[in-house]
Amino acid sequence: MDVPMEKRENDTIEEAHEQDDIEQLVGDFVASQTGSSERLGDIVFQDLSVIGAGVGHELVNNVPEALNRLLKLASPAAWWSKRPAPSRVLLRKLTGTIREGEMLMVVGRPGSGCTTALKAIANMREEYLATEGNVWFALNARHSTADPDRASHLEQDLQTVLQLMGLEQAAGVRIGNDHIRGISGGQRRRVSLTEAFCTRASLYCFDNPTRGLDSSTAIRFLNVLRQYTTRSRCATVMSLYQASDVAVSLFDKILVLNEGHVAYYGPASSAKRTPQDGMQRPVPLRPADFEARFWESSFYQQAVDAAIAPQSTASLPKPSGYALPFYRQIYECTVRHYQIFLTDRGTWIAEATGTIVQALLLGTLFRDQQDVTQGLYTRCSALFFCVLIMGLQASAEFGNTFVQRPILLKQKALRFYRPGAYALGQILADIPWKLIFILYSLPIYWMINFQRTAGHFFTWLVCLYMGLMALSVMFRAIAVFTNSPTRAVLPVGLLLNVFIMYTGFYITPPGMKVWLSWIRYLDPMYYIFESIALNEIGDGSYQCSSDHIVPRGAKYNDTTFQTCAVSGSVPGNLNLSGNLYILAEYGFKYMHKWRNVGINAAFFVFFAILVTIGMERFRNATERMSTIYYQKLPWTNTSTSDLADVEKPPVTTDLGGFDVTSNDEAASSRLEEDHHVFAWEELSLELGDGKRLLHEVSGWLQPGSMTALMGMSGAGKTTLLDTLAQRINIGVLSGGLYLDGCPLPQSMGRRTGFVHQNDIHLDSSTVREALQLSARLRRPESISLEEKMAHVEVIIKLLEMEDIADAVIGVPGAGLNLERRKRVSIGVELAARPDILLFLDEPTSGLDGNSALSIVQLMRKLSNAGQTILCTIHQPSSQMIEQFDSLLLLIPGGKTTYFGPLGPRCKTIIDYFARYTRPCRDTENPADYLLEVSSNTETDWYQIWKESPEFLSTQEQLQDLLHEKEDASSSGSDKAYAVPYLEQLGVVTRRAFINYWRDSDYVLGKVQLNIWMGLMNGLTFLQLSNDLADSRGRMFSIFVSVITGPVLSLQIEPRFIILRDQFLARENESRVYHWSVFTISALLVEIPFTLLGGLIYWLLWHYMVGYYYTSDRAGYAFLMYELYSLFVASLAQLTAALFPTVLAAQTATGFVWLVVNTFNGPLSPPPLTPRGWRWFYNISPLFYYIEGIGTNAMHALDITCKGSEIQMFNAPLSETCGSFAAEFFNMSKATGYLINPDATDQCKYCSYADGDQYVSAFHPH
């Protein structure tokens, strides 16, 4: 395709047009600031130092280490000793000034203190132990005025900002996340930057904002900031790890940091010259040496002179200004929460479905209750379920609080709203939403046949609603004052467990132990249950059921000599007052009905205030940032205090002189040359809505070649990489993938390496363990274990990871830094020795320029050694791009604009584009040039490519390669997995156990949960006697042991999901091990910890309650409880496996356990259950557990009734009680006994004679 010369001339002025557009849009945005806020003016900082927690390295906090720390805390000597917390200096004596309208670039390798400097200048100091020095602002007050037309200005500004950031097309699209599909990663990054930009701040601090953006988009964003900073007279501070010459030219000043030391601060134009001036003998080697040279320079003296604060200055206050008043912040937050509810349809549809299913299940289970005494227990059981649903629903609040916390902290820093306004807005949004949730439960009320009057219905509704609101803010308050979800599970679980126990149903208030009965007064569930029980039963009248009439039979026709064997009955009267029953059985008083609603309202107000205060106190945790945790410390003869000052040798771009192609002693482990040709032809990927992500993309990878995949954000780079690696699972894919001209073998997954952009690792594994697992499971079984381990050590040396080989990978900020994690990611794939090719997705993203070049040079060495590499890359420098052999360049829509060799100094591809557009300048980065010219939407680069001679040449070469067919599996095994199944299971189970062992919070949390819940059960039913109430207590104590299940599930599910996500994201795609290996290993590793927790709980519970101590009965009870504990673990993992996130799984846990517990026996005894549901008992594990352990506990237990439990009836004249009731006791279904058979007037009857009779009422078998 011939492009006219005029077109190429027009392309040369496109930059000027784009610059004019930016200036116009920025001008409009600045002009709309009718109510300009107060400006800080010049920012001055003098001798600014920051001290952080920790010393940079620690032992990993595994179970033995945690126990050791607990023992030390238990020592009285530890109580009085006041050893200072370990600390280290993160930033040292930073001095300088940022004038109005200036931009300061902060440069340094990761860990040098760039982020710390930005936070210190922005006055965000709560994360650090201490800060020293001062930050001032010159007083330059610009008083704000009210905007009379705020709504129209907001809409205008929105459109302006969307155009500035290139987000017009994404304006109405859901942002999404790792689990919810939305906009692209680059667009998501721009949304975050736009959010901060819209604050109209006087001081902007951006920490590596161009990470994840292509160079063209990055330069545009920096241009926008340059224009806005100049026009609005604000100040901008920004750290950049990979800054091009074009980017540097936009800044006024540069700050260079090295391990917290200032190496340079001054004008950007002098930054290159100053290091050269410092290279005088002796040459500075350590960061402190460079700092000393800087202090001797004229630039330091200029910074000190500028930092001498004039008279009209004041200390920089903590940020306090908000654009909106507090009440308006509450309103905006409330509206936002409504929008979240309405747009997150999946969550509320699932919640509504689950609640309605629960309501229908319970409604059919307890349906059509009649006004007879036999239905009183089931009616109260149904009321208890209404309360239980509220408790389980409210307990899920704690998980959602942690999900929202990062967003809240970010927007708090941006001064969008006070955290207290967010809290109150969330509570106000809950007011109608919780009511809707209760309305889902309406089938319960109408199907069960609760009292059908408006007064009773709305009283039931109000009681449940107010109780739900109180419980919700109560559990939310726990989350607000807890640092992590793992630690919040303990108080949430214990509180839920205690609240359920003391609802008043399991153990009635008259039967509560004196020392624990006070708990019910702090239990909102108790107040709900008492009110709805009084509302439903208190003013009713119930006819005595035939089974409750004593004595009964053909002989007994006169009710004068009969009674109803139910609490609250009157001798000679077979009609029972609901008020007397509820008072005698539960101790509930009718006058408390509305009082309880008021108490729950007070609970709601109190904890709402507490949540508001707690959110106002939200801080980023003062963690030991940038700390590396070791399995064992690599230093043995150096004290901790000394280690903080030891300078580590600098990491150079040279790989330690290790030559992967040399014939040294590691020759046996070096990379074998790859002889496979990987090709793809006419690949297209189309979504269901017709959108094309890839469009007829063709190409190939020659053995030992290194190919770059580039394009603008949203061009489809990662999509193409995932497609080539067979990791795409959306849309319709057409075209072909070939290895040596043949279809891909099933072993393709494990014979290729894939380095993810996000560095997916199990945080508890050490570097060496991660590489060893990859080598053991992905290399063929024919290779000995010794050879695999030797190869791992070679890779560790190759990647210069000897000093961190035994370090736990951790998470960013509490583990390895970004560059080291990237090396680990590459090492994991190299340990598997992929013999086909190696995919890398953005391996240099987030790294500084030196580290990025080091990674690319490493890839070059691997390629030279025979490894085929395909790599996506966003912002390569000219040095980096020249390391590649070929380039595949995409534009939005997944269309190809070029595929072929780069040529020496990229001359081949530059000459190609220069035929159709402006030439590349001598000083211009070729990568920036290619992205800039290909982003011109006025030129149809795809059509130019299709009609170019280069395209025809590549097509001919592709067809030649496809016709040179060779069996791709001939050079290696075509098995999907490299090693046998049992070896997979052993290796993965060992890793899972180590993962648990190094998470002391999880293991000790499980122990603590079982200790506290066992103690609560044991103390609540302490040393029960043989009377009727305590016999009931024996049965319900067993049921209380069952309600530990939801609590333990909340703790098990996050651990399972962490392992599952690791498997699905990387190991499953790479065919490391079979999916069933994961599920079995996850269950196997849970067993010992589950059995330990079960043992602790059972010992505390069984003997405190006073069950049988004999070995046969105690042994049976122990076996049954351990089996129940295993069932809990397996059910929790099943629930977690069915849901994508921890929050979704924990929300579903309440529903799952409600269904499971419904058919356990005591809550809905089989004799009273409708026939349509009785089959469910045959498949209910909890029914067998309670039946077995209940029968074991109650068999041959003689029951004696105390005074209040005795039922009275009169005997006829001239007859003793025994003779009169003889016919009744001869009946097969008769239970109980007469206490005074020889009496002739009032007969005293006990409803049950022994435990077997009592159990038969719940379990007829």
Curated annotation (Swiss-Prot):
ABC-type transporter; part of the gene cluster that mediates the biosynthesis of talaronoid C, a fusicoccane diterpenoid with an unprecedented tricyclic 5/8/6 ring system. May be involved in resistance to the products of the cluster. Belongs to the ABC transporter superfamily. ABCG family. PDR (TC 3.A.1.205) subfamily. Residues 71-284, 678-918 form the ABC transporter domain. CDD domains: ABCG_PDR_domain2. InterPro entries: AAA+_ATPase, ABC2_TM, ABC_transporter-like_ATP-bd, ABCG_dom, ABCG_PDR_2, P-loop_NTPase, PDR_CDR_ABC. SUPFAM superfamilies: P-loop containing nucleoside triphosphate hydrolases. One of its GO terms (molecular function) is ATP binding. Gene3D superfamilies: P-loop containing nucleotide triphosphate hydrolases (3.40.50.300). This is ABC-type transporter tndA. PROSITE patterns: ABC_TRANSPORTER_2. It is found in: Cell membrane. Pfam families: ABC2_membrane, ABC2_membrane_7, ABC_tran, PDR_CDR. It comes from the Eukaryota. The keyword Mitochondrion does not apply. Keywords: ATP-binding, Cell membrane, Glycoprotein, Membrane, Nucleotide-binding, Repeat, Transmembrane, Transmembrane helix, Transport. Glycans are attached at N10, N557, N575, N620, N637, N1068, N1226. It is a multi-pass membrane protein. The chain crosses the membrane at residues 427-447, 455-475, 488-508, 596-616, 1038-1058, 1080-1100, 1114-1134, 1136-1156. GO terms for cellular component: plasma membrane. ATP binds at G711, M712, S713, G714, A715, G716, K717, T718. Disulfide bonds: none annotated.
